[in-house]
A protein has these predicted regions:
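RNA pseudouridine synthases
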Residues: 1-239
Length: 239
């Protein structure tokens, strides 16, 4: 099992992706010789949207992959996200519940019309606002947990609520014209920053954390943010 961090910039043509790099690393480990068996096994337990950064979980064998996938399905694999929202939500903490359906390569909220679509699925998330700034337009830093794993869920639900994620050109173009006057940011301001799981072999509880690298997070007081996350305190306002 490996918990790995993805750089906020997606791999482009000719650039190695994280899966290829991990397989290359595993192939070079002592005793990794696999005569006649091809490349090392690497199971992807869960994925992130291409423009999103953060922690990923991989399994080095099928048994571990099955155990970790079971944790994910049962909600025992706990993930937290940081998201930068365009605007200030009225409630500093709350839940968003919507019905989503996939149309091609995008997800669409059909809340209130879900009975019209057989493929509409419920999507639920919980958020807590950690900090609010003006840079130069109103931006809010949210800590997000999801109760379901729908396609583009966090991005679509916040956009549907009127607070699209900074940098999300797919779901928040109108808000981005104000929030990104000179294309100051690139990539979606969303990071899977915290991950907790039970090791599939040892049974040990494990936790991992990363600090976002996307410059969209640079305007927030990250040291203060760490304290807020650890101590469960209130909202910090700056600017």
């Amino acid at each position: 099992m490996s918990a790995n961090r993805r750089d906020w910039q997606s791999a482009g043509i000719g650039q190695p992706d994280v899966v290829s790099e991990l397989k290359s690393y595993l192939a070079k480990l002592p005793g990794a010789g696999r005569p006649g068996k091809g490349e090392p096994y690497l199971g992807i337990v869960h994925r992130l949207d291409q423009p999103v950064e953060g922690l990923l979980v991989f399994a080095k064998d099928k048994k571990a992959a099955a155990a970790l996938s079971k944790q994910l399905a049962e909600g025992a694999l706990n993930k937290h996200y940081y998201a930068v929202l365009c605007g200030y939500p009225d409630c500093p903490e709350g839940d968003l519940v919507d019905y989503l359906r996939k149309e091609g390569n995008v997800a669409v909220a059909v809340t209130g019309r879900e009975q019209e679509f057989a493929d509409a699925k419920i999507a639920a998330l919980h958020y807590r606002i950690l900090e609010e700034i003006n840079d130069p337009s109103p931006l809010a830093l949210a800590d997000v947990t999801i109760g379901t794993g729908r396609f583009h869920q966090i991005r679509v639900q916040f956009a549907h609520a009127g607070f699209p994620l900074l940098g999300d050109t797919k779901y928040g173009m109108a808000a981005l014209k104000e929030a990104m006057p000179a294309q100051k940011y690139r990539g979606v301001a969303l990071c899977a920053y915290s991950l907790e799981l039970v090791h599939p072999i040892s049974g040990k509880k494990m936790g991992f954390r990363v600090v976002p690298k996307n410059p969209a997070f640079a305007g927030f007081a990250m040291e203060e943010l760490k304290k807020l996350t650890e101590n469960e305190t209130g909202i910090s306002k700056r600017g």
